[in-house]
Structure formats: C-alpha cells, structure tokens
Amino acid sequence: CATLGGFIAHRGTGVLSTKYGKIEDMIMSMEVVTPTGDIINTLPVPRHASGPDLTQMFCGSEGTLGVVTKATMKIHPIPAARKFHAFLFEDMHGAMVAGAKLMTSRLQPCVIRLYDNAETAKLIKRVLGIERNGAYLVFGFDGEEAIVDLQMKKAVEICKETAIEDLGTDMGQAWWDHRYKFFYPPYMFQLPQAFGTLDTVATFANIENVYWGMKNAVKEQFPQATFIGHFSHWYDWGCMLYARFIIDEPPKDPSEAIALYNRIWDM
C-alpha cells in the first residue's frame, strides 16, 4: 500500500512516467508540517524565479524535513486512445539503440520497457508466452487517436531498423494487460530464492556500460547468482536500469545465506 504523501516523500514513479513524469513533475504545491511544528505552504505555480523551489526541496526528503499533509496535483484528460506495440531484438544493444532513438526523436511515448535477454527468458516467456530468444521491447502512445497512430507509425519504422521480429500490437497490449502479473506467484521469486534490486539511471551514452559492469561483476565474483535487468523509465537523455541479482539456491545455513547476500551488495 502507498499514499500520496509517500509518493512525494520518496520521489515515486509509475508505469507511464516516460510521458507524464515522476511525482515531482506532477505536483504543483504542498503543505508541510516541519519538526518544529511550523506549517509551510509552497506556491501553487508552474514555475517561479524567486529563489529555491521549496516544493522540489521537500520531494524526496523522506520525512526528514517535515510531513506532507496536503498536496495540489496536476490532472490530465483521459486519453481517447492508448496503443502498444512490441518487438524482439537479437540482443539488448539493438533494442537500446531503438529505444534511445524513440526518445531522441521526441515522439513522446507514454511508456517504453526493455527487458534484457536473461529477463526475457526468465519472465517474458513465462508471462506472455514468447518462445524465441532475444531482448523484448514494448512501447506505447496515448492521446488523440489520429496523433497516436502517427506516433506509432514512426516508432515502428525506427524499431524495424534493428529488430529481428515484429511482435505486433497484440503482444504489446498483452504486456500492458498483464504488467502486474510479474509480481505475483508463480512468476515472482519464492523461497528459498534470494534477490536484490538496484535502480540506476544514466545517459544513453553510459547506460549499457553500467549494465555490463554490474552483470560482469556478479558473474565473475558470484557464479552462484544470476543477473537480470530491464529498463523501465525513459527520459530525453537516458533511462533507468532496474537490475536484480538472483540466488536460486542459496546456502541452506541461514548465516551463510545472509553472508553471501550481503557480500553481493557490498561488491
């Protein structure tokens, strides 16, 4: 469970952040009660030029500067259309090239989600039934249908430059329809498995180096663990890697299992 104040306190984000932004992009103003009992109301304006932005200062402060008691948020019209399309790429690099081009072309997708080959094999195959090996990429657009169709047409052209298979709109829609299924049994991790999750954002020029640096470190130092990752939040200049290390069969002794888990984190 979560609350609006919780979203603000930890700078939360959602599935459609690529178009609609994170919580700090959605908030206009807030009321905050400070540790001294003072009440601060930030200005309900889109931008200002009168010193530091207190609204942004409180976003992500995780309760250290005060408790958010009220918030004024942006609202958006419900889109007339929302459409999805999916592609399979031979490897993550080809998919990343396509994803980066979707963003630098300023097409404004509402979502892009790229799964590396390992996570495609481990989760996408099981949830969506894709049999072929590769890196799975899905994107979507929403808004007025005529505009969405134009955006989709150009995005499909971009992906066809490096993809090995056009999975079509049905497989894209299937991802949207089942996007929360990944977090429920039997698809989510179960005992005795152990795993850790890392969120890292970088520019398009560096994000693949970050990915391979993490993956190779886990592979070389901890052969008993596997590394999977997907890229879930995209920006004009880069994207976020949602990476996981997984220990399918940790040591049966709890102290040894905890020690192994902590060593991976400390790497």
What are these regions (language model features)?
Residues 1-113:
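FAD-binding subdomain of flavoenzyme oxidoreductases
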Residues 266-267:
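Double-stranded beta-helix
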Residues 77, 88, 94-263:
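C-terminal substrate-recognition/cap domain of FAD-linked oxidoreductases
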